[in-house]
A protein has these predicted regions:
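Phosphate-binding P-loop
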Residues: 1-5
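The conserved Walker
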Residues: 14
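Conserved glycine(s) of the Walker
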Residues: 17
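Glycine-rich phosphate-binding loop used to anchor ATP phosphates in small-molecule kinases
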Residues: 59-104, 108-112
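A glycine- and Lys/Arg-enriched "phosphate-lid" helix/loop adjacent to the NTP-binding pocket
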Residues: 105-149
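Small-molecule kinase domains that catalyze NTP-dependent phosphoryl transfer to phosphate-bearing small molecules
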Residues: 130-175
Length: 183
């Protein structure tokens, strides 16, 4: 299978800017994006699952990932570009794709450093609703954000996957297949 499509997977802890980055790439490059949260809520609200928005992340990933991965394969087979963003992308995602598919997929895990979070926590809270309305953000504390990002970075290192460390400033560059910069 020869495909020129590009699939961009964006994951990371809560409040790292996954949806905002996907929206920015959509606007600049006209790549459509799939929010895994939207898929999750559609399946929950239509009663196609017994899971709830507060179900454990592991259970949600186990349920959602097989659907998302097959959507990715379909996009590649149809030579279409797609951005997929959400926290329900497993760290071992590569095992689900043959090499022909992997050649079309770029994976980015967004991680904020402890220093960045401590220095910019007010900004993190301020931009929390820049793309999606969070109904209840009271659980977003500096300690939780630090811990989730620490766990995300440790898991990325353990599984040897690409991660983008947001340390001094929030600036993320993503390369296109043609070596042009997506920003």
């Amino acid at each position: 299978m020869k495909s020129t499509s590009q699939i961009i997977l964006i994951t990371g802890a809560t409040h790292t800017g996954k949806t905002a980055l996907a929206q920015k790439l959509l606007e600049k490059y006209k790549f459509p994006y799939l929010s895994i949260d939207h898929l999750k809520m559609g399946l929950i609200r239509s009663s196609n699952t017994t899971l709830t928005p507060t179900s454990a992340d592991e259970a949600l990933t186990e349920y959602l990932w097989p659907i998302v991965r097959e959507m990715i394969k379909t996009a590649i087979e149809n030579n279409q570009n797609l951005i997929v963003e959400g926290c329900n992308i497993p760290f071992d995602w590569q095992k689900d794709f043959e090499q022909d598919y992997l050649a079309n997929i770029k994976y980015y895990c967004l991680v904020m450093s402890k220093k960045y979070i401590q220095t910019h926590f007010d900004d993190i809270k301020k931009y929390a609703n820049v793309i999606e309305n969070r109904l209840d953000d009271s659980g977003c504390t500096i300690d939780i954000i630090i811990e989730e990002n620490k766990q995300m970075q440790e898991s990325a290192i353990k599984h040897r996957v690409n991660y983008v460390l947001i340390d001094d400033e929030y600036k993320i560059q993503i390369e296109r297949k043609e070596n042009k910069c997506l920003q």
